């Protein structure tokens, strides 16, 4: 049986003699043309610590592909550092990079007729970008997460990158000394690897274990550790076996497996960005999935992991406590996962979890049993109302009472909001409205970690609301509501809010509304005019033209 069903289109037959000539230049031998061609989509980059440790993983995958009697073909994918671009115009490129990465992988895999692809990535958008490509092309593939960073430490306190963002607010509020401010800055990121809490990178990589597209335990390993290198090699070996078994992404990515992934996200307290990304992944896999499905699962699945940003621990702690397999086994025993879903190994999820204990160890408090859940329901709530007729996403963990009604403080760019926060012009009870930051208006839905962290640092996390048609970082917590749709740029009602309007955020009732009459909104709408596009050329303009609404994943195809 031939295992090069795709690559034979480019290597076999008399007419492909020139093609083989080029392969000979790369060191191929005649017998290699009967072997599968396996792409290694290598996201290595020295732009960011999230991706700076990926080359070792790519090298291990290359060696494992060769040892499995297949041909590795290495190509690069770009990355944007969300942490570094945060609060700047560069953040507008973050979500766009998801689409660019997906397009890069699709282009290489399809253009070169690859028989399979090992995708290796680190920073936030690397994960959904890679998975969108695998789902879109349906070429056999596996995702290798670059691994988490190790926690930093200053004066005995563990740190993550969010510690540094929050320190900005604390320092400007006079609640932190200059010594401690600089100490946090210098020690927040002590190694290579992606940001350490259950932020977007760890959320998406963890969910890929539940989805069935990554190996068990791989998402919580630290990038510098040898086990991460070994896992990359094993992932490549497993992919070659999947090629031989003809297991394709769409055999794995189904409505039921996406339900598993979302249940895992709820149980671990994951990032709001997962909503946007799983809408896009489902779209690419041609799986029926809507924003309302997240709310359906939220009501069934409790939060059982005590993880940052709204909890205490980081990914390395989760790994020591049993990792994602332990969380999944608890959910499976509670009837909250579909155990019959296929995984990349060819085994079902239930079979993969057979060796995992039914309950977490008693000597840790990172993973809790169901009966001791931190929250009875999931934390990512879908709010609707006259400010979000298509829906908006709220993260409701970490708050004593996720309800507020207060005056709108309206900003049309992040910098103005940040200046107001740092100048103590935002008061308890206010509701910040940041708009014209959606998929088309931003464009690119930039993340708002800097202002939300400054609010936390100022001690206002429980008392100030924050809504936007942009996004929030996975490191954000507080009374925040993002992904408001329809967005302001297309005339969503968020565009009609005026300074001082009464706004209600009620996560219990799942309501997001501006408390003015329908007649007044209609009058304002008649006066509203769409702003001139911020960009007319280049990738930002292209994304603005193509992107769908956030409630459908901000996809471009």
Swiss-Prot record:
Molecular function terms from GO: 2 iron, 2 sulfur cluster binding; dihydroxy-acid dehydratase activity; magnesium ion binding
Biological-process GO terms, alphabetical: isoleucine biosynthetic process; L-valine biosynthetic process
Cofactor note: Binds 1 [2Fe-2S] cluster per subunit. This cluster acts as a Lewis acid cofactor.
Gene3D superfamilies: IlvD/EDD C-terminal domain-like
Domain of life of the source: Bacteria
Uppermost EC category: lyase
Catalysed reaction equations from the record: (2R)-2,3-dihydroxy-3-methylbutanoate = 3-methyl-2-oxobutanoate + H2O; (2R,3R)-2,3-dihydroxy-3-methylpentanoate = (S)-3-methyl-2-oxopentanoate + H2O
Positions contributing to Mg(2+) binding: 82, 124-125, 447
List of residues that carry N6-carboxylysine: 125
Keyword Iron listed: yes
Entry cofactors: [2Fe-2S] cluster; Mg(2+)
Record: residues binding [2Fe-2S] cluster: 50, 123, 195
PROSITE patterns: ILVD_EDD_1, ILVD_EDD_2
Catalytic residues (positions): 473 (proton acceptor)
Pathway(s): Amino-acid biosynthesis; L-isoleucine biosynthesis; L-isoleucine from 2-oxobutanoate: step 3/4; Amino-acid biosynthesis; L-valine biosynthesis; L-valine from pyruvate: step 3/4
Segment forming the signal sequence: none
SUPFAM superfamilies documented for this protein: IlvD/EDD N-terminal domain-like (SSF143975), LeuD/IlvD-like (SSF52016)
Keywords, sorted A to Z: 2Fe-2S, Amino-acid biosynthesis, Branched-chain amino acid biosynthesis, Iron, Iron-sulfur, Lyase, Magnesium, Metal-binding
Annotated EC: 4.2.1.9
Quaternary structure annotation from Swiss-Prot or TrEMBL: Homodimer.
Protein family membership: Belongs to the IlvD/Edd family.
Function: Functions in the biosynthesis of branched-chain amino acids. Catalyzes the dehydration of (2R,3R)-2,3-dihydroxy-3-methylpentanoate (2,3-dihydroxy-3-methylvalerate) into 2-oxo-3-methylpentanoate (2-oxo-3-methylvalerate) and of (2R)-2,3-dihydroxy-3-methylbutanoate (2,3-dihydroxyisovalerate) into 2-oxo-3-methylbutanoate (2-oxoisovalerate), the penultimate precursor to L-isoleucine and L-valine, respectively.
Name by which UniProt lists this protein: Dihydroxy-acid dehydratase 1
Annotated organism of origin: Cupriavidus pinatubonensis (strain JMP 134 / LMG 1197) (Cupriavidus necator (strain JMP 134))
Gene name of the encoded protein: ilvD1
